[in-house]
Amino acid sequence: TGRQEPETDIGVEVFDLWTPERRPGGQLLACTVETADDTDRSPFAPENVTSFDHRPVLGPNAWVADPRDPDPRVTVSWDAPQSISQCLVFFDTDFDNAMETVLLGHEVNAVPHCVRHYQLLDDEGRVIHEETDNHSTINRVDWKIPVTTKSVSLRVLSTWGAPAAVFGIHCYETPVV
């Protein structure tokens, strides 16, 4: 809320402003989403991490961990072993919260849905990368010696307060960035 009181000689009237509170209490009002028993039909399905829509466009486009899962993880896999030298992981850092200007800044230091601590695991469950204090949207992991595996799993160990949300996991034989 506020009030605009311009100088009297410029021809603009005094008026009150009302600005709604952003994400009041961190809650989405009047909305409950439950995980479907059939995750293939869930709007937050694991398959979303293979999409290249790394923001909510016509749907969530993210895998969201079940808050009841004590060991949440999402896996991308292939029929045959792949040689991977780079992995790009795209986390939810609140793309749907508009920032009218970069001068406005963000009202929180850490976005609740962003994954804070995670591991990448190969097809035998070995940790091939670990990040312990992530704040970033895009995590680029480069291996000097390529990893050969039939799958890469992202294991979420902690977030900044809300269930983990992941927009993408993309693995490359040759680095793309």
Question: Residues of each region from the PLM?
Answer:
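Hydrophobic beta-strand segments within beta-rich accessory/binding domains
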Residues: 85-89, 154
